[in-house]
Amino acid sequence: MEAERAAKVGIASALLVLAGAAIAAYGLDQFSKFLVVSNLTEGEIVPVLGSALQWQFVRNPGAAFSLASGMTWIFTILAAAVITFIVWFARRIRSIAWAVVFGLLLGGVLGNLTDRLLREPSFGLGHVVDFISTPWLIPAIYNFADIAIVSSMVLFMILTIRGIGLDGNREVRATAATPAAAASDATASDAAASGGRAFSAGPELARES
């Protein structure tokens, strides 16, 4: 194994990228929800690209993509725990890509947590505003916070598969030797084989003499 340097940055740059991604995701999520609540009635469907993309205002008491309804308080606690972990863990990040991962996750989780804390019916039990409907893709209705969370998970898997660490270094396997090294190995093998044959032929020559 050998280390290959990826997009490695200092702690200040990594935190700046993380904060930027989080602010962008959170801002887009909250602004879009403000427009939806201000301009649509609950349950209303507005075609954007026919039936492929629609706005449909619903209030979701569950998790992302309207899953596990009725467990709002559990997701509120989990979201707060995730945010606390990211803030604590952020100083270890030295990679731009990983900073984007945690930034998108932070912004998305914070966006839905804001709804659960501040929206009806009560503090900590608020319903999340969902409005993006793509029936051809998934039956659930979601929002930009959900998109940010899923995007962070996809990027997380890509970075993990590629072996890129939090420090920005990538571990790669030496799958093939260089031509010079291969030629050197072949020469050494031939020499060893020739020496072995000469050694084994020695006793036979002695017996014949």
Which ranges hold each PLM region?
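Alpha-helical transmembrane bundles and membrane-interface segments of multipass inner-membrane proteins
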Residues: 1-209
